């Protein structure tokens, strides 16, 4: 399973890359606006750091506008993946962009039916929103599992990115389902490291080592 960071913060991305566990990044206009950064410049900076897929979202909602923006964004770096909303015009744009060799990520997916359309259009990635679906019906993980099963049934090449991840159990459950990628906020990534027994074990080891050193001095 690949791990993506859902952020536009360069310091968070640097830490994840230094840990050696981050394979890519997903962004959106909201995340970039929070950083106060110029959009295209920040996308380039992220691509330079990650050397892996970086999803950058279009803001147009019409077919022509999405395709135009996508072509411009794709010029920034070979790592750029274009995030396209799950709409009729969006799916049409995905079909066009896929034919041109431009990688796409269909976002704001909330049902298996939508995920089928994304795969049929040739999307590189599809992003089901687990946490937001949980907010509505507590069925986020079930939706994700159904998408995994459908894609396996038909051998779709579109990779599934579990998005809107709220806590470590989302990550574990997605991994158990065989999801290709999980994208998460930096805070959730940090939580994956933590377990009270790990902290207790380190504390005990350090106490024993301290006693050992004290005994050597006697």
UniProtKB/Swiss-Prot annotation:
Belongs to the transaldolase family. Type 3B subfamily. It catalyses: D-sedoheptulose 7-phosphate + D-glyceraldehyde 3-phosphate = D-erythrose 4-phosphate + beta-D-fructose 6-phosphate. It comes from the Bacteria. The lineage of its organism: Bacteria, Thermotogati, Thermotogota, Thermotogae, Thermotogales. One of its GO terms (cellular component) is cytoplasm. Keywords: Cytoplasm, Pentose shunt, Schiff base, Transferase. Signal peptide: none annotated. It is found in: Cytoplasm. Disulfide bonds: none annotated. The active site is at residue 83. It holds the Pfam family TAL_FSA. Its EC number is 2.2.1.2. InterPro entries: Aldolase_TIM, TAL/FSA, Transaldolase_3B, Transaldolase_3B/F6P_aldolase, Transaldolase_AS, TSA/FSA_arc/bac. Its main location: cytoplasm. This is Transaldolase. GO terms for biological process: carbohydrate metabolic process; pentose-phosphate shunt. Transaldolase is important for the balance of metabolites in the pentose-phosphate pathway. Does not show fructose-6-P aldolase activity. GO terms for molecular function: aldehyde-lyase activity; transaldolase activity. Pathway: Carbohydrate degradation; pentose phosphate pathway; D-glyceraldehyde 3-phosphate and beta-D-fructose 6-phosphate from D-ribose 5-phosphate and D-xylulose 5-phosphate (non-oxidative stage): step 2/3. PANTHER family: FRUCTOSE-6-PHOSPHATE ALDOLASE 1-RELATED, TRANSALDOLASE. SUPFAM superfamilies: Aldolase.
């Amino acid at each position: 399973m690949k791990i993506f960071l859902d952020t536009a913060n360069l310091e968070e991305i640097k830490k994840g890359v230094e840990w050696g566990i981050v394979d890519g990044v997903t962004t959106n206009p909201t995340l970039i606006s929070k950083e106060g950064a110029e959009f295209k410049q920040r996308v380039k900076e992220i691509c330079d750091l990650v050397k892996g897929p970086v999803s950058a979202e279009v803001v147009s909602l019409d077919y022509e506008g999405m395709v135009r923006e996508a072509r411009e964004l794709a010029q920034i770096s070979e790592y750029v993946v274009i995030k396209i909303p799950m709409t009729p015009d969006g799916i049409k744009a995905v079909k066009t962009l896929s034919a041109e060799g431009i990688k796409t990520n269909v976002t704001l997916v909330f049902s298996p039916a939508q995920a089928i359309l994304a795969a049929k259009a040739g999307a590189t990635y599809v992003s089901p929103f687990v946490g937001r679906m949980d907010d509505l019906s507590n069925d986020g993980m079930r939706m994700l599992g159904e998408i995994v099963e459908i894609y396996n049934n038909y051998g779709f090449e579109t990779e599934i990115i579990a998005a809107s991840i709220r806590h470590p159990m989302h990550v574990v459950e997605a991994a158990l389902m065989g999801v290709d990628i999980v994208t998460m906020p930096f805070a959730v990534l940090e939580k994956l490291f933590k377990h009270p027994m790990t902290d207790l074990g380190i504390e005990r080891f350090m106490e024993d080592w301290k006693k050992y050193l004290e005994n050597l001095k006697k």
